[in-house]
Design a protein with these regions (language model features):
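Short beta-rich binding modules
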Residues: 1-124
């Protein structure tokens, strides 16, 4: 007996993270860069196949014209509020992240709200 259900879907891989994929991630921490004084490092935690992956994104405190600012970066988070003056309210919240890869290292290419998307679906 054959059917065509799922015929065109890829079977999920048990491989580690894959670049250009979107994952649900928790913002684990924000700290100063060990390499550059003028950057904050956002560390997101992804749990995949029972393994924990920490993926980072560095954002410049004083961005150039072609760089994203910290305020712009935070606006993409699930619980963004202009009234937040510290990172504490963002920690432990879930977000969607797009993972990139550069020279064998993973990084967060982009972030999007997860909770607001789920609320919108419930309210429709």
């Amino acid at each position: 007996m054959t059917n065509n259900r799922g015929q065109h879907l890829s079977i999920p891989s048990s491989k580690p993270l894959v670049k250009d994929n979107i994952y649900v991630a928790t913002l684990h921490s924000v700290g100063l860069s060990n390499y550059e004084d003028n950057k904050h490092v956002f560390t997101y935690e992804v749990v995949l196949h029972g393994q924990i992956y920490n993926i980072r994104r560095s954002i410049a405190l004083e961005p150039s014209n072609n760089q994203i600012s910290i305020v712009q970066w935070l606006k993409s988070h699930s619980n963004y509020s202009p009234s937040h003056t510290e990172y504490g309210p963002y920690i432990d919240h879930k977000h969607l992240i797009l993972v990139g890869e550069y020279e064998g290292n993973y990084f967060v290419r982009d972030v999007a709200p997860l909770e607001n998307l789920m609320e919108d679906e419930v309210n429709e």
